[in-house]
Amino acid sequence: MRTALTIAGSDSSGGAGIQADIKTMISNGVYAMSAITALTAQNTTGVTGIMEVTPEFLGEQLDNIFTDIYPDAVKIGMVSSSDLITKIADKLKEYDAKNIVVDPVMVATSGARLISEEAIDALKSCLLPMATVLTPNIPEAEVLAGMKIQSQADMIRAAEEIGTKYHCAVLCKGGHQLNDANDLLWRDGGYKWFYGEWIDNPNTHGTGCTLSSAIASNLAKEYDLDESVERAKKYISGALAAMLDLGKGSGPMNHGFAIKNEYTESKVEE
């Protein structure tokens, strides 16, 4: 069985972060492992608390994973401090990690920065050059490329700028900012559009985590990058189309929409 590792924060509501990553990886047919960067207290209405692990403990988690069940792919989500980012980069180099998918979580949809400038600098210098593919949304791509993105042409220019600078592939996600579900993959000097169905579902908590984890899962299964993106987009469309409605705010998707067997059935009252 192929294996995948997620390095990210825990979401107590289960919709994003480590929990979304593990659900996604299992649903995409790989064995999921995790190294937790932080615990969060949150639900569908917001985050009320964050407790980071120490760099030493994060390193210990990664040592235990890589020396026993070596991951065929690695997904990296939100890491909020430069010390943690540096520790991750050091361990990925030490163990010669492969198929590294970086979701550079830096900016909220509102435009507010989620991590410090010091952490962003560490992300740029340590982690991004190690990536197989980056999966920024529009605000994140604007930060990395140093330009505003208001059109598909801007997405192409930004992805090329980022990919050329960090020597990796870039999947620039359209999403809500451009009011479509079309994503741009830039790599090796060329680009390809992946067109998706826009699904009118307000419950989109964890979509970025889910997409990057699905890509990592498919890379672990030896699909090439184009195929991995295509399959990941199809999976996330299914999870959104299942129209799960939980919580008082922007709720989670149904990551297990395709899993149906005798163990998933609810009890029927006679």
Task: Specify the residue positions occupied by each region the protein language model found.
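Conserved N-terminal subdomain of the carbohydrate kinase-like
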Residues: R2-T6, I26-T109
